[in-house]
Regions:
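Transmembrane helix-loop junctions and nearby membrane-interface residues
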Residues: 24-31, 57-58, 91-98, 155, ...
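N-terminal signal-anchor module of multipass membrane proteins
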Residues: 2-36, 42-43
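Transmembrane alpha-helical segments and their boundary/interface "anchor" motifs
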Residues: 16, 40-48, 59-93, 98-115, ...
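Alpha-helical transmembrane segments
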Residues: 10-21, 81-88, 142-151, 199-204
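Hydrophobic alpha-helical segments with transmembrane-like composition
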Residues: 90-192
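Alpha-helical transmembrane segments and terminal signal-anchor/GPI-anchor hydrophobic tails
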Residues: 192-222
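Membrane-interface helix-boundary motifs at transmembrane edges
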Residues: 2-6, 61-74, 129-141, 185-197
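Hydrophobic transmembrane alpha-helices of secondary-active transporters
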Residues: 47-59, 180-187
């Protein structure tokens, strides 16, 4: 029998999946409207997936090197091997354009389609023991600062300096997503800060919608 809490997280995963589908079926428009705002709201899909992953991984006992190694030996092949297998069709399709060596390197780095998420989650698997040991206040403060600085840096490089950074390079750095995974880990460890979390979540949601609106005034709709 599935526990009630498992149903809850299955529901959240379903919502996140719908958001991902909406993101990848969205067509950019040239003016601000309700569709653009909805598209911006859908951007919480990846953070939601990371928080859910952090919740369950954070419950695991990784206090010793033996337990940590056993966890990695079990978990890494479960996500990395399927990614490599599903990358094969992309390698065959793009063989003439990128060549076998560059194509294989891209595949190993999660560069086929949206597989960057697999590399990202592997990074968090490696960081989980450190996150578990750091106190709530320190982990939230440090992770929030790191994520903020990371986002500012990549926005500067991609939208101001106009560097063409591919998705598998601008999406995989853990520093861009760290705070979301940390929140999940701390929830998984039984720390309760739901009202503070919801207030922060809604603040940044409306801030992102405002950013989209003012950004679109200059004819640049995200």
């Amino acid at each position: 029998m599935i526990k009630e809490k498992d149903w809850y997280f299955d529901f959240l995963r379903g919502i996140a999946i719908v958001m991902v589908i909406a993101i990848h079926t969205y067509v950019a428009v040239d003016e601000i409207n309700g569709i653009v705002l909805i598209r911006q709201a859908m951007n919480c899909a990846v953070p939601l997936f990371l928080a859910i992953s952090g919740y369950f991984i954070g419950k695991k006992d990784l206090s010793s090197l033996e337990k940590y190694n056993a966890f990695l030996k079990k978990q890494l092949p479960r996500v990395y091997v399927p990614m490599l297998l599903w990358s094969i069709p992309f390698l065959l399709i793009n063989f003439r354009h990128s060549g076998i060596h560059l194509g294989m390197l891209t595949a190993f780095l999660g560069g086929c389609s949206v597989f960057y998420f697999i590399i990202l989650i592997i990074e968090f698997y490696l960081l989980t023991p450190i996150i578990q040991k750091v106190s709530l206040s320190k982990s939230l403060a440090v992770s929030s600062l790191i994520t903020l600085v990371g986002i500012i840096l990549f926005v500067y490089l991609m939208h101001i300096k106009c560097y063409n950074i591919p998705l598998y390079l601008n999406g995989t750095p853990f520093l861009l997503w760290l705070v979301f995974y940390v929140l999940g880990v701390k929830f998984g460890n039984g720390v309760s800060f739901i009202w503070w979390f919801l207030s922060l979540a809604f603040f940044f949601l409306f801030a992102s919608l405002g950013e989209t609106y003012f950004y679109s005034i200059n004819g640049k709709v995200a």
